[in-house]
């Protein structure tokens, strides 16, 4: 399955999600490869850091050297693509090959507007997968304080956008994600019993229900 993790607006946390998902899949025994199409190359940097620190499982991250869609479709396992608006040509090509698009949306009106524009681009410019491309959005970097209304308001606004499914599993803004990246590790590798780790397991299990278990 080809999952493209994308958003028009910067700062959505897509590279962090892509990295944690890639390691989560690998830790469940899945064959997974990643494509880093973002000029910032965060996913590639994290994979290189893991290699230097000899952290297992090792991640296999590729850049594009040929026709992108052919590369993506050549892999038999799970494919994760990290791409943003800074590489619009690659984004459009990746979206054309995607089985599903995962859109992380921080809790703000500006991010809702960006998501709305992103959906317009998909419908206008992207040749849909013949089997249908699933469009999934979720609130990323959600407020940990439940009394702050922006998270719920963002989720409600996303639910009003046509043609998109809103995942109920939020990823909250926790320092564990930021700190673990500096070590080339995921939040569930460094702090397996933390709130952030448990929230991510729930989130990933919803995306891959056939792997709905915490790895031993």
Map each language-model feature to its residues.
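P-loop/Walker-type NTP enzyme "switch/lid" segment
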Residues: 2-8, 12, 23-92, 156, ...
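Conserved catalytic-core segment of NTP-binding enzymes
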Residues: 3, 28, 33, 84-169
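Beta-strand-loop-alpha "switch" segments that mediate conformational coupling across diverse proteins
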Residues: 154-185, 200
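Hydrophobic positions on the alpha1 helix immediately C-terminal to the Walker A/P-loop
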Residues: 16-17
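NTP-binding/hydrolysis catalytic cores, primarily Walker-type P-loop NTPases
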Residues: 184-216
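Active-site loop signature of alpha/beta-hydrolase-fold enzymes
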Residues: 40-42, 110, 144, 174
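Active-site catalytic microenvironments for nucleophilic, acid-base chemistry
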Residues: 24-28, 121, 206, 210
């Amino acid at each position: 399955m080809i999952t493209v993790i994308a958003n028009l607006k910067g700062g959505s946390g897509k590279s962090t999600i892509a990295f944690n998902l890639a390691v989560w899949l690998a830790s469940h025994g899945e064959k997974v490869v990643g494509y880093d199409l973002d000029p910032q190359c965060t996913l590639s940097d994290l994979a290189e850091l893991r290699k230097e620190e000899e952290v297992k499982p090792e991640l296999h991250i590729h850049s594009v050297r040929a026709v992108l869609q052919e590369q993506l479709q050549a892999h038999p396992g799970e494919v994760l693509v990290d791409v943003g608006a800074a590489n619009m040509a690659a984004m459009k090509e990746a979206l054309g090959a995607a089985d599903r698009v995962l859109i992380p949306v921080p809790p703000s009106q500006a991010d809702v507007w960006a998501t709305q524009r992103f959906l317009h681009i998909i419908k206008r410019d992207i040749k849909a997968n013949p089997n249908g491309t699933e469009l999934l959005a979720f609130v990323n970097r959600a407020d940990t304080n439940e009394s702050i209304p922006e998270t719920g308001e963002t989720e409600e606004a996303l639910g009003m956008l046509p043609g998109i499914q809103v995942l109920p599993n939020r990823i909250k803004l926790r320092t564990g994600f930021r700190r673990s990246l500096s070590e080339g590790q995921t939040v569930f590798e460094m702090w397996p019993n933390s709130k952030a780790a448990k929230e991510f397991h729930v989130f990933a299990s919803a995306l891959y229900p056939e792997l709905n278990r915490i790895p031993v």
